[in-house]
């Protein structure tokens, strides 16, 4: 789906950048991050969201026998995402720890130097990783951004590749993808000249 972070306010970008990590730490639907692996035990299926500069997507994969589980997970990403405050707090703590470690990492220093050279020290779309960036990450903003970017499936294209038979796949698509709520609004990305 077109749009991505190009449609967000600058103040929302830090929250958008780490939103997918929080979702992965939160679980899905009614299942916490500790319950979900138990529910999926013995199955090979996953689905995850991504928000890029110009697009947002939900990708999934599975073995053939677990296609329905993967489609259920895609469906839940649209209609019942899970944002868990504990998952958010874990990510913030990881970022705080990373901030300490990266001070001694020559690769990170080089990356910061390149960012400053290309965009300046205070570019709102290409911020340096520091205390200010971490402070601007908001749990509530993440939920709002997610609803904005994934609240309408009308402009998503679904591509399915694999060895599943069409006769088996069609009723699953009708059950899980065709039932995702949409409104007729289609978006496009915005050129923010970064």
Provide a role label for each language-model segment:
Residues 1-24, 28-80, 92-100, 106-136, ...:
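M16 family metallopeptidases and their MPP-like homologs
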């Amino acid at each position: 789906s077109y749009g991505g972070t190009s449609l967000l306010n600058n103040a929302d970008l830090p929250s958008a950048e780490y939103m997918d990590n929080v979702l992965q730490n939160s679980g899905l639907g009614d299942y916490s991050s500790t319950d979900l692996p138990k529910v999926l035990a013995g199955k090979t299926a996953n689905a995850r969201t991504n928000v890029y500069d110009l697009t947002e997507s939900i990708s999934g994969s599975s073995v053939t026998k677990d296609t329905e589980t993967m489609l259920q997970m895609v469906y839940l990403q649209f209609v019942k995402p899970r944002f868990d405050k504990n998952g958010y707090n874990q990510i913030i703590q990881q970022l705080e720890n990373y901030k300490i470690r990266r001070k001694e990492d020559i690769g990170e220093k080089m990356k910061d130097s390149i960012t400053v050279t290309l965009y300046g020290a205070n570019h709102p779309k290409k911020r340096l990783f520091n205390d200010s960036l971490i402070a601007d990450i908001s749990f509530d903003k993440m939920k709002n951004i997610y609803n904005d970017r994934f609240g309408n499936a009308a402009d998503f294209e679904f591509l399915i590749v694999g060895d599943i038979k069409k006769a088996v796949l069609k009723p699953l698509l009708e059950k899980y993808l065709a039932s995702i709520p949409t409104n007729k609004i289609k978006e496009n990305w915005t050129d923010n000249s970064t």
